[in-house]
Every structure is written in structure tokens, then in C-alpha cells.
Amino acid sequence: MSRLALFDLDNTLLTGDSEVLWVEFLMARGQLDCSLAERNADLDQRYHAGTATPAEFCEFFASTFAGSSADEWAPWREAFMHDVIRPRLPAAAFALVRQHREAGDVLVRTTASSRFLVELTAREFGFGHLIATELATDASGRFTGRTSGTLNMRDGKVTRLHDWLAERGEPVAPALAAATFYSDSINDLPLMLAVGRPVAVDPDPRLALEASARQWPVLNLDRLRSNNNNNNNNKT
């Protein structure tokens, strides 16, 4: 197997948090009650501080999809991608991913955000693999507002990556030893400790301290340059 290049999404390749931005997007368009603004901001702050639990963080954002199917949410997701997400994707992020693609690495996006919300962003970057939090559905295919399976956050990111490697028949230890993982967040410390080459990207204060103490590389992306042109040019 080629080397793994693992990438977090929110505040790493994306400037901002996709699920926090999703709630703001829906509230601005009257699709969610604006009373959720305080809860949204509180979870965002506590996530960055590393004090929000995976369950409360992931379940809150899963609740925003409750009662509708993927097909019903699709137009909203497309508008969100166009209006909010794409302008927040720095050209430097595409260049970083392209560097690993050209090196022949296996590109994996691993994120605490829900698969449904972020799969368009993964496609935008040309990721072949996506590990994300899964949304539960009922018998009719509508989202229940709950999550399903292991949450892809903190220790769950390590568990889900182990499962993904096992499904592919790949030995876990050598794959992780050769892997690079990019993240901004202290919440990703378990996976950063598990790989051979952790890289802190515009790290939050707690991760910056860890990176300094452990002499990990620190990367500062040029976030002033968005990628509003033809993103296909970044996938070659």
C-alpha cells in the first residue's frame, strides 16, 4: 500500500467549521430557529478548547438534518457548498493536497463532521477516501437527527481509521507508522500521536503547545488567497 496522507477538514483545509457554518447558513435562510445560535456558538467555542464531548458535538449537528432525506437536503447542500464553503477553501490547501497526490500517496479525508455535509468538499479536493461521522436514517430514508456508529472524533478517529484499514486488508501498524496527518485541533491529538508524521496546521493554542513540546512540524496556510477559480486545475 502507498503511504497514507490523512487530512482533517475544518479549520485545516477549510477556513472555518463546516457544521457551525451550516447552522448559520440554515438560520439565515429561515430553515432553523435562530434560538440555536447560542448553542451553536457555545459548541464551537468548546470544541476549539477541547472541552466539548464527541457525543454532544456530533449529535447537535446531526439534529439539524432531522425529518428530511438526503434528496430533500441536496439543494440546500449544493447552495451551502457554492455560497459558503467554496470561498473558504484556500488555494494553499489545494496545493498541499496536490503535493501528496503527485507523490503517489493515498489521500484520506477524516473529519468529525457528517459524511453527508462534507462529501462535496471531499470531491472538490479530489479525495478518493472519506472517513466521517455517519447520520442515522429511518426506514423511509429520512435522517433521524441522530448519528450512527462510532463518532469520528478524538479517539474515534483512531478507531475508525483502524476499521478502514482492516476493511482494506492493510496491516495497521506499518500503515500508521508511514502516515502523515494534518490537523489544526487538540481534538485530533489521539490520531496525531498514532501516526509517524503529524503536522499541525494553523494549530489552536493547545495543539500549538503540543507541537512545540513534541517538535512536530507546524504549517501555516495562506488563507488570504481563496480558490474561487476552476478548482479542477488543483486536481491534476
What are these regions (language model features)?
Residues 36-40, 57, 175:
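N-terminal alpha-helical segment
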Residues 1-52:
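Active-site neighborhood of HAD-like aspartate-dependent phosphohydrolases
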